[in-house]
């Protein structure tokens, strides 16, 4: 299997070529089981599974229960494969592989919800969300995120940003409008907090996450917002020592810790660390959603509130959102109950791990001086640029090709001058094909490499 990238990437590329050429792999051809392929070619089964899943997500393969994996019919009469997101959305940090959304499982769950729901479920219901989903979600968070979760403490919200808006409004009404955020962090999140009337102050981030010792005047803080599982954009987890120090500070000064469990489900070198809320449920509000694991369009998330905050949050939620999207709640509860959601997470982890590996391999081979940062996890890769390049020039080049890569400078509370040498990129890789990854890296290298760098490769076709 010659060519760039890891074994899974090369196997997928070879199968893709054979399918396009016709011959032995014609539409309807049943592929050998993954175990058989792995044994015949001396590969791990995980490599073969990742290659099959990659091609299924691209529309080259199709699978049916009990009939194996087949070459999809790509002829004119075939059902068109779901369209891939445009390159600019695919490269945006945090965008999942939307082609991998489990449409069949979701449709089956939706039908089951419609069939089984009681007439009363069509009413206004509980502002916290349907009890069945809160029960299933609490069990999932206990088992997979180490949370101290009960159904009564959970609110089902319209995504993490919706839950953060509820918390921000409550902080403002309670006269605690000062909030500390990580520096660097998401510019959109900071804009949301300011829009809700909060005073935002920054706290530096290093290799261990948020620098707790740098928190100034903690007695004046209402809350600290952080991403401890996989910091955005630096990609580092909050260390155990920092977690303990932050919890002590929160309890001593009455500070609410708002944990955005950003990318908490995705770690590729080991099991992801448990959530901070499991260590300190009395002072931590946990935010999560399915925007990264399933699709942003579902607008499904959760807020696990500390006991002292739950009554006020439920009261405020009832004023603006007296009920949720019950059908979606029941469908997601079905996915959780049957194990389909956790199976989907396992599949997507393998796929994203393969794409991240392809990106880091391409950077190492084709872009010397471009240094990946952070731990192996999440849906984005922070990359430090070499000192001879300029972030603004590299961003302009990749965006001109349609890739909405973000700059590290924009994530700082005080952005650096645009002509500053070096800088960095934040590349969303989860929805990029291997061909697009190779092209993007080539464009970035041509714009940010040494003066003698060759030109960029042609765009993927």
PLM regions with names:
Residues 76, 184-188, 409-414:
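Short, polar loop motifs at secondary-structure junctions
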Residues 1-113, 122, 318-324, 333-336, ...:
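N-terminal basic, amphipathic alpha-helical segments
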Residues 160, 206-207, 211, 215, ...:
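Hydrophobic multi-pass inner-membrane translocation pores used for secretion
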Residues 106, 286-349:
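Conserved core segment of the aminotransferase class I/II
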Residues 179-181, 258, 406:
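Short hydrophobic beta-strand element within catalytic cores of glycosyltransferases
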Residues 120-253, 265-267, 271-285, 352, ...:
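Conserved core of the PLP fold type I
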